[in-house]
Each structure stands twice: as C-alpha cells, then as structure tokens.
Amino acid sequence: ILEKYPLAASCGRVCVRFCESACRRQTVDGAVGIKMLKRFVADQAYPLAEGVFPKNLTPPANANKKRVAVIGAGPAGVTCAYHLLLNGVAVEVFEAQQTSGGMASVGIPSYRLPKDVLKAETEGVIKRLGGKVHYGKRLGQDISVDGLLARGFDSVFLAFGCSKGGMLGIQNETPTPKGYSSGIDFLLDVHKHVECGEPFSLEGEVVVVGGGNVA
C-alpha cells in the first residue's frame, strides 16, 4: 500500500468506496472490503504514533541533489512530497493553514478522521522521510513561485486546493447580510477558531441549507 500513497489510515476511514460498488467479486459473494483492509493494515501493521517506517521505503540521502518546493500540505501535496523524498529529492512543503491535511483537516470531523491520524500521515510522514513543513505560508502573500526558485529550489509543485465556498445562485443572493456564509467558509472559520484561537462567535438560530457532507 505504501508504495502507492501514504494515506492508508486516513483513506481507510473516510473513503466512499466507489471501487467496491464496481468490484467483480460481487458476482460471487460480495465486494472486497478494500477500505477496511487498508485501515486494518495501517492501524495494526503500520504504527503511526511510533514513527516506524518500513525499511524498504527508507529514502536515499538527497541522492540526486535536487530541491523541490511543494505548495500545499493536503493529500496531493503530501503524496507528491512522499514520492519525491523516497527518490532522494530534498522537499520543503509550504502550507497556508496552521496544520497539514488540507480540507480533510478542516471539513472532516474528528470522530470520522482523528486529527492525530491525519497529522501522522501528512506532517509525520514528511518529517520522518527528511522533509520540512512550513505553516502560515500563503502563495501570493508570504511566498511566490519566483521567490522560491530564487531561493535555490529546482522546481515548484502547486498543490493548493479550491477551498472556496460556492453560493446557491438564487435571486438576490448576497454574502453581505450578517451571519450569511457558505459551508466551506464556515468550516474554515471554525477551524481557525479551534486550532489557532482566532475570534469566532455564533448566536441565535442557525439554518443549514443542504444535506451533503459539508452541511
């Protein structure tokens, strides 16, 4: 599993299992429970909290002398950094938020995806493989592609997400009234309050429009 991607424990908890609905094993008795199998392996044979990493995946010490900056510490950025580090590339990850995991750390509640599991598979894996993670570094504000290249990085991988809330598109819709917010923006505000201590308050009755995961 780890030869492909480093997020087995996280995916084993929150994956929506599209592959299982198309699994040909259903014609015999039932789909292969790949989601739970990955979670079991990750939880039992891959002790995240102990910092143990399979010997066959130990990276060479900056074997090719290359340096790569990865913008974004979500699943895409972490997976990119993971494979680069395993191939001996020096990697530094720059994340706008104060924690790794991308929207998974903001939009998925802890009872479904524990924060320590996500942190271990993102920041933890990168650091164990010799990479660095910088928080509070927003592209276009704190860092730039040209600036990173000028600092000696050979390449820059852009892995920032699209964490911007959408509107309903109804008549007279405007985000200006007090208390009006998209679901994504609301989750981001709550996350910043809980994790970073930024001010946030919620008063009165609340109406949630929608019935999906964000809602």
Q: Residue locations for each model-derived region?
A:
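Flavin (primarily FAD) binding-site architecture
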Residues: 160-176, 180-181
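N-terminal Rossmann-like dinucleotide/flavin-binding domain of flavoprotein oxidoreductases
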Residues: 1-4, 18, 37, 104-154
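Conserved beta-strand segments of alpha/beta enzyme cores
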Residues: 90, 130-132, 179
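Short Fe-S-cluster ligation motifs
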Residues: 1-19, 41-71
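Glycine-rich FAD pyrophosphate-binding loop
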Residues: 89-105
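Rossmann-like dinucleotide/flavin-binding elements
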Residues: 70-94, 135-145, 164-166, 185-215
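Iron-sulfur (Fe-S) cluster-binding segments and ferredoxin-like electron-carrier domains
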Residues: 18-44
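Redox-cofactor binding/interface segments in oxidoreductases and associated redox assembly factors
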Residues: 156-159, 182, 208
